[in-house]
C-alpha cells in the first residue's frame, strides 16, 4: 500500500517544472499554493457528497489523496516528514496526542 503512495509522491516531485500542457500535475504545481489548496477543498467537498450519497467514494478519496500530495509538494512539505510524525504517534491515543500539542 505505501509503495503506491511513494511512487505517486515521486511522480509528483518529478513533474514540478515540466511542461504544463502535457501534465496536469505540472499544471497544478505551476499555479501555486492557493490554487492547489482551492482544488483540494473542492475535492474534499466532492468526497463529502460521495460519502453522503454512498456513491463514488473510492474514486473521490483517491482524488483527495492525490490533490493533498500535490498541495504538500507545492507548499514544500516533505511527505517523509509526515510519515515520521505519524510513526511518532503510533500507540498514542488521539486525545493524548492532542493534549500534548
Regions found by a protein language model. Give the residues of each.
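Flexible "arm" and connector segments at domain edges
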Residues: 1-61, 65-101
Amino acid at each position: 500500500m505505501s509503495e503506491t503512495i511513494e511512487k505517486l509522491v515521486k511522480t509528483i516531485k518529478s513533474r514540478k517544472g515540466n511542461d504544463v500542457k502535457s501534465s496536469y500535475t505540472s499544471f497544478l504545481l505551476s499555479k501555486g499554493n492557493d490554487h492547489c489548496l482551492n482544488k483540494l477543498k473542492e475535492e474534499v467537498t466532492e468526497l463529502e457528497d460521495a460519502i453522503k450519497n454512498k456513491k463514488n467514494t473510492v474514486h473521490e478519496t483517491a482524488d483527495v489523496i492525490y490533490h493533498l500530495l500535490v498541495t504538500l509538494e507545492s507548499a514544500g512539505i516533505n511527505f517523509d516528514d509526515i510519515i515520521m510524525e505519524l510513526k511518532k504517534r503510533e500507540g498514542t491515543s488521539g486525545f493524548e496526542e492532542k493534549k500534548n500539542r
